[in-house]
Amino acid sequence: MGTSLLCWVVLGFLGTDHTGAGVSQSPRYKVTKRGQDVALRCDPISGHVSLYWYRQALGQGPEFLTYFNYEAQQDKSGLPNDRFSAERPEGSISTLTIQRTEQRDSAMYRCASSL
């Protein structure tokens, strides 16, 4: 009988509960099989026009991914490759999508907003 190695990709958010005073992110945690697509959602503070996505791998500092001003993506230089994309179509809620997840995508994904 052969053995197979099943790799899981673990994605997570901190502070995902919406308190009315902060950014809301969902899902709170996401565990998926390698090769699956994942969409992470960020609902910024009401009235904030700028939105930022970051990721933080275990034992590492935060790494910038992308930045929006209203719905316009101003800087996507931190998106690691073409499997990562982000959108903010109406200048409010943003979605970060990771296609065909890989083990190296395991990290804490965070968003932040500002005026």
Curated annotation (Swiss-Prot):
The keyword Glycosyltransferase does not apply. One of its GO terms (biological process) is cell surface receptor signaling pathway. It comes from the Eukaryota. PROSITE patterns: IG_LIKE. Residues 22-115 form the Ig-like domain. GO terms for cellular component: plasma membrane; T cell receptor complex. Disulfide bonds join 42-111. InterPro entries: Ig-like_dom (IPR007110), Ig-like_dom_sf (IPR036179), Ig-like_fold (IPR013783), Ig_V-set (IPR013106), TCR_beta_variable (IPR050413). Residues 1-21 form the signal peptide. It is found in: Cell membrane. Its main location: membrane. Keywords: Adaptive immunity, Cell membrane, Disulfide bond, Immunity, Immunoglobulin domain, Membrane, Receptor, Signal, T cell receptor. SUPFAM superfamilies: Immunoglobulin. PANTHER family: T CELL RECEPTOR BETA VARIABLE 7-4-RELATED, T-CELL RECEPTOR BETA CHAIN. V region of the variable domain of T cell receptor (TR) beta chain that participates in the antigen recognition. Alpha-beta T cell receptors are antigen specific receptors which are essential to the immune response and are present on the cell surface of T lymphocytes. Recognize peptide-major histocompatibility (MH) (pMH) complexes that are displayed by antigen presenting cells (APC), a prerequisite for efficient T cell adaptive immunity against pathogens. Alpha-beta TR is a heterodimer composed of an alpha and beta chain; disulfide-linked. The alpha-beta TR is associated with the transmembrane signaling CD3 coreceptor proteins to form the TR-CD3 (TcR or TCR). The assembly of alpha-beta TR heterodimers with CD3 occurs in the endoplasmic reticulum where a single alpha-beta TR heterodimer associates with one CD3D-CD3E heterodimer, one CD3G-CD3E heterodimer and one CD247 homodimer forming a stable octameric structure. CD3D-CD3E and CD3G-CD3E heterodimers preferentially associate with TR alpha and TR beta chains, respectively. This is T cell receptor beta variable 7-6. The gene is TRBV7-6.
